[in-house]
Amino acid sequence: MVQAWYMDESTADPRMPHRAQPDRPVGLEQLRTLGVLYWKLDADKYENDPELEQIRKTRNYSWMDIITICKDSLPNYEEKIKMFFEEHLHLDEEIRYILEGSGYFDVRDKEDKWIRISMEKGDMITLPAGIYHRFTLDEKNYVKAMRLFVGEPVWTPYNRPADHFDARVQYVKFLEGTA
């Protein structure tokens, strides 16, 4: 099951857990109130998984690819890692399914505090359009993930501040319960 927690304020190595002290765990229900969706799947059978196919069909995730993030396989690795960790939003959902390895998605809560979501093999997450977030590897420096999209793949990050985009306006309304 996924683990999530409020982060400390440290700017040290982002690959470390950065748990607030005292520890402030975050459950799936709290993540759902932010629009974050989570599934635990069997990553060993991702190529022929009826549960994954049902999720894709229900949510219209019609396109996918696989990305491996590690120094040996990702061109411009250092540049990409910095870009992924820059706080940003997207105009569409961001959907990731961890097939191997691990990393962290950080998302902002309703009070603009960071929540760290630990992602490991078998974890699938959907971040809503308009949520400020970032991604980093953990100390293992390796993740292989399936990226899913509705229609043609679009992965355009808009670094904060990006409050003027309709996706952000709609997300804030969702948080306020008025969407």
From Swiss-Prot:
Residues binding Fe(2+): 88, 90, 94, 133
SUPFAM superfamilies: RmlC-like cupins
Reactions it catalyzes: 1,2-dihydroxy-5-(methylsulfanyl)pent-1-en-3-one + O2 = 4-methylsulfanyl-2-oxobutanoate + formate + 2 H(+); 1,2-dihydroxy-5-(methylsulfanyl)pent-1-en-3-one + O2 = 3-(methylsulfanyl)propanoate + CO + formate + 2 H(+)
Biological function: Catalyzes 2 different reactions between oxygen and the acireductone 1,2-dihydroxy-3-keto-5-methylthiopentene (DHK-MTPene) depending upon the metal bound in the active site. Fe-containing acireductone dioxygenase (Fe-ARD) produces formate and 2-keto-4-methylthiobutyrate (KMTB), the alpha-ketoacid precursor of methionine in the methionine recycle pathway. Ni-containing acireductone dioxygenase (Ni-ARD) produces methylthiopropionate, carbon monoxide and formate, and does not lie on the methionine recycle pathway. Also down-regulates cell migration mediated by MMP14.
InterPro entries, sorted: ARD (IPR004313), ARD_euk (IPR027496), RmlC-like_jellyroll (IPR014710), RmlC_Cupin_sf (IPR011051)
Species, as recorded: Rattus norvegicus (Rat)
Summary of the tissues where the protein is detected: Detected in prostate, liver, heart, brain, muscle, kidney and seminal vesicles.
Listed pathway(s): Amino-acid biosynthesis; L-methionine biosynthesis via salvage pathway; L-methionine from S-methyl-5-thio-alpha-D-ribose 1-phosphate: step 5/6
Membrane topology field: Peripheral membrane protein
Cofactor stoichiometry and binding remark: Binds either 1 Fe or Ni cation per monomer. Iron-binding promotes an acireductone dioxygenase reaction producing 2-keto-4-methylthiobutyrate, while nickel-binding promotes an acireductone dioxygenase reaction producing 3-(methylsulfanyl)propanoate.
Quaternary structure and interacting proteins, as annotated: Monomer. Interacts with MMP14.
Family according to the record: Belongs to the acireductone dioxygenase (ARD) family.
Keyword Transport set for record: no
Enzyme class, broadest EC rank: oxidoreductase
Annotated positions binding Ni(2+): 88, 90, 94, 133
One Gene Ontology biological process: L-methionine salvage from methylthioadenosine
Highest taxon, organism lineage: Eukaryota
Molecular function terms, GO-annotated: acireductone dioxygenase (Ni2+-requiring) activity; acireductone dioxygenase [iron(II)-requiring] activity; iron ion binding; nickel cation binding; oxidoreductase activity
Source lineage: Eukaryota, Metazoa, Chordata, Craniata, Vertebrata
EC number, as in UniProt: 1.13.11.54, 1.13.11.53
This protein's name: Acireductone dioxygenase
GO CC field: cytoplasm; nucleus; plasma membrane
Induction: Up-regulated by androgens in the prostate, but not in the other tissues tested.
Segments for region (Disordered): 1-23
Protein's cellular compartments: Cytoplasm; Nucleus; Cell membrane
Cofactor(s) demanded: Fe(2+); Ni(2+)
UniProt keyword terms in alphabetical order: Amino-acid biosynthesis, Cell membrane, Cytoplasm, Dioxygenase, Iron, Membrane, Metal-binding, Methionine biosynthesis, Nickel, Nucleus, Oxidoreductase
